[in-house]
């Protein structure tokens, strides 16, 4: 049986965690940052874990993660 393909867009956006979860970065941090408050930009830094309701969909897109 041939190898399954990962969704390349998802592979660039999600990283697998040791416990079976996934981490992702926040949106809204690429451009138009001047009108956003310092507090908002600070809270958008770093990584976030994928919500449990989306976990199955992300896992299906990344079969080898």
From Swiss-Prot:
MF terms in GO: structural constituent of ribosome
Cellular component GO terms held in the UniProt record: cytosolic large ribosomal subunit
UniProtKB keywords: Ribonucleoprotein, Ribosomal protein
InterPro entries with a match to the protein in the record: Ribosomal_bL35, Ribosomal_bL35-like, Ribosomal_bL35_CS, Ribosomal_bL35_sf
Origin: domain of life: Bacteria
The gene coding this protein: rpmI
Keyword set includes Transmembrane helix: no
Keyword DNA-binding: no
Record-given protein name: Large ribosomal subunit protein bL35
Biological processes annotated in GO: translation
SUPFAM superfamilies in alphabetical order: L35p-like
Similarity field: Belongs to the bacterial ribosomal protein bL35 family.
């Amino acid at each position: 049986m041939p190898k399954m393909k990962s969704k390349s867009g998802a592979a660039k956006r999600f990283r697998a965690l040791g416990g079976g979860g996934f981490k992702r970065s926040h949106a809204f941090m690429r451009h138009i940052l001047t009108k956003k408050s310092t507090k908002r930009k600070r809270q958008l830094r770093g990584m976030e874990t994928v919500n449990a309701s989306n976990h199955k969909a992300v896992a299906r897109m990344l079969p080898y993660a």
